[in-house]
């Protein structure tokens, strides 16, 4: 359970981000995480409709729903426990944009051939200072160069084995990867929890979600031949 902290800030970046186009439909894949409903509410507050699906469904659901964006939720364990890499492949095949959170980032890394390592000290309910390393990042557009985020993980993306298709967009002070984006596809992810109370200052967490939702839902829905 997070400690609820009242945070005051004169900086509110959310006011600088364009609104999400009306009628956008997002699928949120639930990997058995207690934050999933909070994450869904953050996405809804951006103006999009959200349908939450528990993992384990048929791949054909993407053809039926034709979402504008798929969000991969956090969750316990490893990405393979929930077939997250397979979900990533299914979305890529259909040209569906993806946003991953925590386990979602790890699954994206593995889907493209990367590897995960285990932290020496698990970060569960721990705040860290994030450093934005890519000024052109979709996720962190208009945000400060550094800010506090809430972390809940023991696995992390091995930077030495990061696939060439992915670029690092943010790190911690000890250089743990906190943000990635695909070099050419509409795929992005964060290792921290944007919906955490610890990522609240100036509505930073909501701004990150609104950035990716506003940008990635602009893509046309194209179902590619398998």
Residue ranges of model-derived segments:
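Histidine-centered divalent metal-coordination motifs
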Residues: 102, 153, 193
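N-terminal beta1-alpha1 cap of cysteine-dependent amidohydrolase-like domains
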Residues: 1-86, 90-96, 200-226
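Catalytic beta-strand/loop cores that center a nucleophilic Ser/Cys/Thr
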Residues: 136-185
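Cysteine-nucleophile active-site neighborhood
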Residues: 64-142, 146-148, 211
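Conserved beta-strand segments of alpha/beta enzyme cores
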Residues: 49-51, 115, 148, 167, ...
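Short gly/ser/thr-rich secondary-structure transition/capping motifs
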Residues: 50-56, 131-132, 170-173
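C-terminal and late-domain segments of enzyme folds
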Residues: 167-171, 175-226
